[in-house]
Amino acid sequence: MVVEADKKALICSFCSKKQHEVKKLIAGPAVFICDECIDLCTDIMKEENKVALKQITSSIPTPQKICGILNDYVVGQDQAKKILAVAVYNHYKRLEYVQSGNNDVELNKSNILLIGPTGSGKTLLAQTLAKILDVPFTMADATSLTEAGYVGEDVENILLRLLIASEFNIAKAQKGIIYIDEVDKIARKSENPSITRDVSGEGVQQALLKIMEGTVASVPPQGGRKHPQQDFVQLDTSNILFICGGAFMGIDSIITSRTNHSSIGFAANVNIDKEKNNSEILKSLEVEDLTKFGLIPEFIGRLPIVTTLDELDKEALITILTKPKNAIVKQYQKQFELDDAELVIDYSALETIAEKALAKKTGARGLRSILEHLLLDSMYKVAELKKQRVTITKEVVNGLVEPIMTSLISTKSNKKQPIIADIPA
């Protein structure tokens, strides 16, 4: 009798309806929720998703505007910018279409693969896109990922970073962008399937398949391995845009081998590829080349948009140093300005810096380290001396002389000199 009385006393903890007044009453730890409250919560979540999506899609610039903003930060790579601008614009328009409920034509998600040498701007392009669109963005290094159950990061940790970037707003996170760098490092060790497990290569590719295609993933909010008893957050990856990038060192040889093989015969020009640089060779990239490199066909299939980035020449590196809104030299000039000092760099010095970066094959990424090394002693001194003008010449870059320091107080005019001297028009 006591049990029967208890059953009759059960009520929903949210709306206070009794058990016999609702269809279902679901029990939790010391609480109950009825089916009507569950439906109401579901409607609230759907409405929040619509609002979050509307905020994103209503502010999407056109492909031309996206490309224009990319030009302010990224030098060169015009074709890659155009492809990315169109792909991102179409991706978020697709979300708007899906949310509208008009499903006459099913629009599939188009993830992106960026292939280009180190320091060519792959990461910067992805970061700038996220900034333009004002959506949650996170980066992951594919080299740290391993198959579940092995030492290393699980692929779900990538989704956790996106959740953190969105301040655990699930609706926003589900419309975010994930950039996976060094994806060429998870290529399988040989073209033929291996009997032994390849936990950091093919195993990672297999683990990434589902989240890239679209699935409801269980994300551990405190990290997967240190807190196994935690509750999981359910995150739908169907509308998350994945951008993968990698240098793919050696793929040019695979392309050259294929193109030379296809041109065997009396009319074949055997020297044609010797005259091409890597950027021109990469433009002939086919899916079979990626397969030979070590990406499995299923993984390639999740990346329908493939674009290649050009190698940066000396002029491009000089432009990167001086022209963009966040140009490296402008950043150092601002740091000197905060110490009541000025920084002037001769054009010949810029040329030498660019040549050094080219020799190291580090692309734009190596420019900052070269400048940091050149300016270290000057930054150490001007913080104490104040009112100093530091001039960097070609001889300074080559290590023949120290940076030239002159007092601004002793000069007749305190009018600031240009950040860079003697730049040709």
Swiss-Prot record:
The keyword Chaperone applies. It comes from the Bacteria. GO terms for biological process: cell division; proteolysis involved in protein catabolic process. Keywords: ATP-binding, Chaperone, Metal-binding, Nucleotide-binding, Zinc. The keyword DNA-binding does not apply. InterPro entries: AAA+_ATPase, ATP-dep_Clp_protease_ClpX, ATPase_AAA_core, Clp_ATPase_C, Clp_protease_ATP-bd_su_ClpX, ClpX_bact, P-loop_NTPase, Znf_CppX_C4. GO terms for cellular component: HslUV protease complex. GO terms for molecular function: ATP binding; ATP hydrolysis activity; ATP-dependent protein folding chaperone; protein dimerization activity; unfolded protein binding; zinc ion binding. Zn(2+) binds at C12, C15, C34, C37. Transmembrane segments: none annotated. ATP binds at P117, T118, G119, S120, G121, K122, T123, L124. Residues 1-53 form the ClpX-type ZB domain. ATP-dependent specificity component of the Clp protease. It directs the protease to specific substrates. Can perform chaperone functions in the absence of ClpP. Belongs to the ClpX chaperone family. Component of the ClpX-ClpP complex. Forms a hexameric ring that, in the presence of ATP, binds to fourteen ClpP subunits assembled into a disk-like structure with a central cavity, resembling the structure of eukaryotic proteasomes. This is ATP-dependent Clp protease ATP-binding subunit ClpX. The lineage of its organism: Bacteria, Pseudomonadati, Pseudomonadota, Alphaproteobacteria, Rickettsiales. The gene is clpX.
